[in-house]
């Protein structure tokens, strides 16, 4: 039994798991493993962008997954962060997060985009080192990540800001402050955690893909569970779907240890200089 436990632990090490997946698909390159708390999925996409722009690869496959365990659940319970009810991001009656499981994959290529392509325009990772589990109360790390990722992109060109929105007291309050500081308070905001919970390592990839599909469809998903504003800085949040004709969005994530990531995604025609 002891040998089986050791063998299983060895197989489940991140590097070994990544190599097995690459080997299964016949890819002989050494996988790059990105493990940075809850921003891992978005951090991996930003890493892919940098690898492509540096000319190291022509195509990068980014995949992320996470499953629940007694260790993970007990960890969140120790922070009193879990809700026994369905989570309610940014709502006045929110009581904590729900955990979920998922796996998601997205493929990036270095090429001249056609109008229907999605382009990762820019991404940034910033840290605030406020606390091992609590974010900066002024949203400093998230604010700096947003500003760095936005660059010259105008807020009014964004259809959506897909936020972390975990439904915890501190995260949602921090994000509302960061978004207002960055001038994004009038851009439609949603959190997808109410649909499938917090999928941790998969969240950044899964929520990016769903946001792409949402904007492609011209319908922004509502924030499930939201009813009444429960943060100090107002945001444009709706529990109901909304229509849009815009073709760009921002994705935000934050994680334990004070890590924050932001990225801007844009359709190829806008990226190539089309009308906004």
Features from the language model and the residues they span:
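Acyl-CoA/ACP chain-elongation machinery
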Residues: 56-78, 83-87, 94, 123-137, ...
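Short beta-strand-to-turn element immediately C-terminal to the catalytic PLP-Schiff-base lysine
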Residues: 106-111, 179-180, 238, 263-268
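Flexible, low-complexity linker/loop segments at domain and module junctions
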Residues: 155, 233-276
């Amino acid at each position: 039994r002891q040998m089986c436990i050791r063998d299983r632990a060895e197989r489940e090490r991140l590097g070994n798991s990544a190599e097995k997946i690459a080997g299964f698909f016949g890819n002989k390159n050494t996988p790059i493993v990105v493990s940075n708390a809850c921003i891992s999925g978005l951090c991996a996409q930003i890493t892919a962008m940098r690898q492509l722009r540096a000319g190291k690869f022509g195509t990068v496959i980014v995949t992320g997954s996470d499953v629940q365990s007694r260790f993970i659940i007990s960890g969140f319970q120790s922070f009193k962060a879990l809700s026994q009810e369905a989570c309610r991001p940014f709502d006045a009656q929110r009581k904590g997060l729900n955990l979920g499981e998922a796996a998601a994959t997205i493929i990036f290529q270095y090429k001249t985009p056609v109008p229907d392509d999605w382009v990762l325009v820019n991404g940034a990772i910033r840290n605030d080192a406020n606390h091992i589990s609590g974010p900066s109360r002024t949203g400093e790390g998230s604010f700096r990540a947003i500003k760095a990722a936005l660059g010259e992109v105008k807020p009014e060109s964004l259809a959506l800001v897909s936020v972390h929105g975990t439904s915890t007291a501190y995260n949602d309050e921090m994000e509302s402050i960061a978004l207002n500081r960055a001038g994004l308070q009038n851009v439609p905001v949603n959190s997808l955690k109410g649909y499938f919970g917090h999928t941790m390592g998969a969240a950044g990839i899964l929520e990016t893909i769903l946001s792409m599909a949402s904007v492609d469809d011209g319908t922004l998903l509502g924030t499930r569970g939201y009813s009444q504003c429960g943060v100090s800085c107002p945001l444009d949040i709706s529990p109901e779907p909304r229509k849009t004709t815009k073709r760009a969005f921002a994705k935000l994530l934050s994680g334990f240890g004070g890590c924050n990531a932001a990225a801007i995604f844009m359709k190829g025609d806008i990226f190539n200089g089309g009308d906004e």
